[in-house]
């Protein structure tokens, strides 16, 4: 257990998970999409509230609600805990065919609020995921002396409707 994390199966109601997975825009779309291509890999993201269809909008609203954030705080012990209503680093994240992301650290200070980003929630919504594609999230221990990842401790397969919640620090590889 290299850092605090929680794996949650069946995160959403199954029908909501199926329906929201169909709301994603096409990977090649250019409307309200930010494309990342660099040393960590290639992906497309969208965090524009105006672009989200109804169910996606509702789910993000629920995830950012005081009730849900209070529940996360109680479960994780993180206090105070604030939602990121601007979805900086959040929203839809998509990889194309053959896509991958290299091991990296997420930024830990929010660019607008200057608050520490403390928790990260990833929800996998690829209903037809095939384990042969790879794509597992790897959790690594931290080498304190070198400030780099040390040993792979765990892999989390991106199974449909599985969420992983984890501590976002400069040691959470």
Stretches with model-predicted labels:
Residues 50-172:
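Catalytic core of non-heme Fe(II) oxygenases with the double-stranded beta-helix
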Residues 1-76:
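Non-heme Fe(II)/2-oxoglutarate
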């Amino acid at each position: 257990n290299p850092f605090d994390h929680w794996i949650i199966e069946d995160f959403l109601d199954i029908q909501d998970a199926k329906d929201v997975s169909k709301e994603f825009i096409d990977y090649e779309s250019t409307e309200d999409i930010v494309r990342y291509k660099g040393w960590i890999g290639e992906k497309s993201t969208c965090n524009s509230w105006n672009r989200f269809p109804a169910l996606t909008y509702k789910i993000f609203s629920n995830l950012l609600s005081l009730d849900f954030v209070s529940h996360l705080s109680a479960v994780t012990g993180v206090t105070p805990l604030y939602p990121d209503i601007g979805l900086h680093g959040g929203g839809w994240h998509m990889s194309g065919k053959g896509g991958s992301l290299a091991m990296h650290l997420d930024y830990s200070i929010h660019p607008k609020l200057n608050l520490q980003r403390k928790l990260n929630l990833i929800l996998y919504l690829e209903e037809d995921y095939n384990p042969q594609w790879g794509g597992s999230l790897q959790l690594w221990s931290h080498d304190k002396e070198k400030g780099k990842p040390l040993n792979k401790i765990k892999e989390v397969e991106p199974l449909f409707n599985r969420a992983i919640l984890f501590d976002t620090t400069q040691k959470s590889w």
